[in-house]
Regions:
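Acidic anion/phosphate-binding donor-loop and adjacent secondary structure
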Residues: 130, 145-162, 169, 183-185, ...
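Conserved donor-binding/catalytic core segment of Leloir-type glycosyltransferases
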Residues: 166-182, 191, 201-202
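Short acidic alpha-helix that forms the nucleotide-activated donor recognition element
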Residues: 242-254, 271, 275
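Nucleotide-activated donor-binding/catalytic signature segment of Leloir-type glycosyltransferases, i.e.
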Residues: 205-207, 213-249
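Conserved acidic donor-binding segment of nucleotide-sugar-dependent glycosyltransferases
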Residues: 294-306, 313-320
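Short hydrophobic beta-strand element within catalytic cores of glycosyltransferases
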Residues: 259, 279-283
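Donor nucleotide-sugar binding/catalytic pocket of nucleotide-sugar-dependent glycosyltransferases
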Residues: 116-130, 134-152
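A charged, aromatic-enriched C-terminal amphipathic alpha-helix characteristic of glycosyltransferases
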Residues: 319-374
């Protein structure tokens, strides 16, 4: 089975999501072959499955060598479908965040309309898409925990020493990039609300200097960086990404983690923090809000910043009541990388057997609707493979 992922080389990305899934899927089933690249999407018809990740990447807006129109995208999807190449997509976003180009926004609807499977990282988007795209099979494929990558759980004392932090403070962790000033406002709100408390915020990428050719733009970047350093001393940031080695220490030193997003559907930070036993505070938005509420973690209202300090206080209270330990159990039971990889393999194989005569359509419909659980689905696929 040959599968094309519509993204650039995943082994050159800071985000381990794609390479972790690729490596673990290949360990489980050596018959699955992966390739990637936007150019191959437009030129190559030799794949069994085309798995689309971020639809707007296919247009390459602003790249004169690879730029394509929305009309060209729809024609290409029609060609793939006519050649019986299966089209599937993962719903990382319903529409792209912070994009204003109308064709980039419309590319999402275009791809989802042509997808036979749409994989969802939570039940919120799955519910929305079952109404909006009823002809697709909307399937749950949660964000994995990279338990093969993060194997160390250093003690709080060891983590404090490693990161050169004082034991006098409680720490709130915000990992990941800050995409807009409205996300920085969340952190500044916490600092102002807890100025009399011994609380610091670990936000490595809170502000970074982007080196630009324009000297005035560069001066502005440096000024902004220094301004935050001087005025917000309780925000600990370096402007650099945290290595996989150091990330375990950041996780271990923090009791509460904040997902600093206003516009969001999914978050890789959420399952990872659960795995390390932290309580997670996040926006009551998308799959993130749905998962947090379902598991008893605090949420805040993105339209009311005053709800954020309330959620943070609740987060610390819940940590001391043992919610972090419960979160860890949830992650270990549901989100380990092997479990999610197994699930993805089964979904890929469903594409093959769903079009094959002799397979019970009633069972397939039950699997697609979620009325047959994953374990039964996996056993059914093994049986079909033996009978094929």
């Amino acid at each position: 089975m040959k599968i094309l992922l519509t993204l650039d080389n995943p082994y050159e990305s800071d985000n381990p999501y794609f390479r972790e899934l690729i490596d673990n899927i290949k360990k489980i089933d050596s018959e699955i072959e992966f390739d990637w690249g936007i150019k191959k999407f437009w030129a190559n018809n030799s794949f069994d499955i085309v798995h689309i990740m971020f639809p707007h990447f296919l247009l390459k807006i602003g790249d004169k060598n690879e730029e394509h129109s929305l009309e060209e995208l729809e024609l290409r999807l029609q060609v793939l479908k006519n050649k019986n190449i299966k089209i599937v997509s993962t719903c990382h976003n319903i529409v792209p965040h912070y994009k204003s180009n109308i064709e980039q926004i419309q590319s999402y609807d275009c791809v989802y309309r042509y997808s036979e499977h749409i994989y969802h990282l939570g039940d919120y988007s799955r519910g929305v898409f079952e109404k909006k795209y009823p002809n697709a099979n909307n399937l749950l494929l949660e964000h994995p925990v990279y338990n093969d990558l993060y194997t160390e759980f250093p003690s709080r004392e060891k983590a404090l020493k490693k990161l050169k932090l004082s034991s006098k403070y409680k720490y709130i962790l915000c990992i990941g990039a800050f995409r807009d000033d409205e996300e920085r406002k969340l952190i500044c709100k916490i600092v102002k609300s807890f100025k009399k408390k011994k609380i610091k915020i670990l936000a490595p990428l809170f502000c970074k200097i982007k080196f630009k050719k324009n000297i005035f733009s560069l001066i502005k970047e440096v000024f902004t960086y220094l301004r935050y350093k001087i005025l917000f001393k309780r925000i600990v940031f370096t402007g650099k990404s945290v290595s996989d080695t150091l990330l375990s220490y950041y996780m271990s030193v923090s009791d509460v983690s904040l997902i600093q997003r206003v516009k969001i559907l999914n978050s890789g930070s959420l399952p990872l923090n659960y795995y390390f036993g932290n309580v997670v505070v996040g926006p009551n938005v998308g799959n993130v809000g749905e998962i947090l509420k379902k598991t008893g973690n605090p949420t805040f209202d993105v339209t009311d910043l005053n709800s954020l300090p309330v959620a943070i206080r609740a987060g610390f209270d819940l940590f001391y009541m043992g919610l972090g330990s419960e979160n860890k159990k949830i992650a270990e039971k549901n989100w380990l990388i092997k479990h999610i990889s197994d699930k993805q393999i089964s979904y890929y194989k469903l594409l093959k057997i769903s079009g094959r005569g002799g397979v019970n359509k009633y069972i397939l419909d039950k699997i697609y609707s979620g009325k047959i659980n994953y374990s039964f689905m996996h056993s059914s696929l093994l049986f079909v493979k033996r009978c094929a």
